[in-house]
């Protein structure tokens, strides 16, 4: 689709600060409210495949964050093992509640102050907060060179508009999170993981074997 193509194109032109850090830190945040229950397990499986994509490129450390229920917010320890992270994710039970995307963005900024984040992935299907405030937070992340990769499950137009604006303001990218096209979705997540672990040069190499990754070069800020 055009949206997927634009997402893939933007990732490849997102600036990554190069340094001597041994690993890329990727914050993986998910909405774990009741509406996501039916797709949670499949989404977890796809997320775990992100680690495999970075083998031989550079190490990737991932922290899982999610919100659910009545003001519940959780963040895991940083993890470089797909098995450990998948075990943690599979133990999460979705509970009804309002979105708390602002808490995820606040947490991300605090983590970045401790040690730099390379990227943030967010998967959700709703927005019950003030979009203007979230866009302001996204803009702050953009100043810090921490791009947001916003994945939307479902097709709510208001949610889509807000997610797109947040991605743009942070210097990141937006894409539908379509579990009916698991292969395509895997390629999208893989491209973000490779970007976080090895930067643009690693992503460029991936484009030679992954058509979706090849398209991930135009949506992000240059």
Predicted regions and their residues:
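Von Willebrand factor
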Residues: 1-77, 81-123, 127-129, 154-164
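Active-site-proximal beta-strand/loop segments in catalytic clefts of secreted hydrolases
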Residues: 65-68, 123-125, 151-154, 177-179
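VWA/integrin I-like adhesion module and closely mimicked acidic/polar interface patches used
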Residues: 126-169
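C-terminal "exit" segments of structured domains
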Residues: 170, 174-222
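Surface-exposed acidic, glycine-flexible loop patches that form ligand/cofactor-binding
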Residues: 17-19, 53-56, 109-116, 140
């Amino acid at each position: 689709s055009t949206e997927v193509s634009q997402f893939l194109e933007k990732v490849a032109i997102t600036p990554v600060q190069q340094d001597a850090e041994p690993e890329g830190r990727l914050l993986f945040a998910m909405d774990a409210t009741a509406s996501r229950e039916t797709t949670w397990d499949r989404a977890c499986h796809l997320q775990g495949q992100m680690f495999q994509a970075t083998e031989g490129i550079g190490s990737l450390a991932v922290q899982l964050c999610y919100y659910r229920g009545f003001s519940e917010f959780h963040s895991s320890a940083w993890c470089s093992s797909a098995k450990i992270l998948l075990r943690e994710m599979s133990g999460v039970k979705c509970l009804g509640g309002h979105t708390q995307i602002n808490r995820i963005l606040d947490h991300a900024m605090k983590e970045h102050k401790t040690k730099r984040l390379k990227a943030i992935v967010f998967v959700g299907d709703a927005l019950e907060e003030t979009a203007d405030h979230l866009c302001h937070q996204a803009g702050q992340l953009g100043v810090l060179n921490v791009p947001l990769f916003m994945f939307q499950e479902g097709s709510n137009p208001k949610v889509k508009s807000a997610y797109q604006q947040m991605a743009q303001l942070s210097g990141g990218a937006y894409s539908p999170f379509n579990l009916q096209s698991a292969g395509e979705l895997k390629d999208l997540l893989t491209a973000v993981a490779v970007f976080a672990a090895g930067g643009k040069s690693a992503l460029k190499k991936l484009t030679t074997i992954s058509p979706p990754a090849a398209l991930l070069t135009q949506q992000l800020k240059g």
